[in-house]
Amino acid sequence: MSRSALVENVMAMLEDAGFLVSDRCAIRPKSFDIAARRGEDVLLLKILGNIDAFDAQTGGEMRRLGTYLNATPIVIGLRTRDEELKPGVVYFRHGVPVLSPDTAMDLFVEEVPPLIYAAPGGLYVNIDSEILADVREDRDWSLGRLAKELGVSRRTVSKYEDGMDASVEVAAELEDLFDAPLTSPVSVLDGAEEVRDDEPTPDDPDVAPEDEPIVTVFTRIGFEVHPTDRAPFKSVNESDDEHGQVLAGHSAFTETAEKRARIMSSVGEVTRTRSVYVVDELRRESVEGTALIEKEEMENIEDAIDLRDLIMERGEDREEVA
């Protein structure tokens, strides 16, 4: 299956599952392919045939964007260089959960979360430590008795009851022994934080010199500016008050800039953010929901209210963002 067909299939699957799905980010470079929202769940998705193509720089940016936009970064892929991705298993690349299309279908359409995750050494599951301790005590088994049944040390059983995860084989044996479900699903929509390696999120990239005047304006009027490396927008700008978040782009108004502004509008609708594109010369007032503002005009903005009013006047006033 081509990557383009895979992206289209994932988009159709998400729409069938009730998600609002953004336009595809058909520009390069791009840290994510689509954004999607269902209720309060917001996803940023990268879709790949071979997940080994997902590099650390892209993973870091997706995790940063997930933080700024209250979204979960997820990769959906078919295989690694060595094997097909197994259904029902969560993999990880650079701190981002990775699912096969079948696993994504189960999670988003059937609402059946995966139980298994891959980590160095094999496949593992979350053991509900409280239930395990309860069923062992109900049977009046000591830690040593259970350890003997499993063929492991007493210390290992104690660790299971303290929250250590178990291999798939051990988990299956435990459930057979006690005839009870003892596993907990992987919370993919919360970033699978309980099982993924605790990798620190990389710092924001440096601001490009040509974008510094725009960053200065956002900072001066009270926004915290988060530059991006590979997103269709140059920065995510956060305000603690009612002005919320603004996606910002900046360049001459070319055909590529128009595509970026259109994608920003679509992503903004999904993530409930406004978007503005700063251009050298104003030829029109908006591209769909993205307001266009001339650079000199931007530099003369006095406060966040002025910016908000200008964006609302020129862009489409979407209720979801109000």
Curated annotation (Swiss-Prot):
Coiled coil: none annotated. It comes from the Archaea. It comes from Haloarcula marismortui (strain ATCC 43049 / DSM 3752 / JCM 8966 / VKM B-1809). GO terms for molecular function: DNA binding; DNA-binding transcription factor activity. Transmembrane segments: none annotated. HAMAP family: HTH_type_cro_C1. CDD domains: HTH_XRE. The keyword DNA-binding applies. Residues 143-162 bind DNA. Residues 132-189 form the HTH cro/C1-type domain. SMART domains: HTH_XRE. It holds the Pfam family HTH_3. This is Putative HTH-type transcriptional regulatory protein rrnAC2519. InterPro entries: Arc_TR_HTH (IPR020886), Cro/C1-type_HTH (IPR001387), Lambda_DNA-bd_dom_sf (IPR010982). Keywords: DNA-binding, Transcription, Transcription regulation.
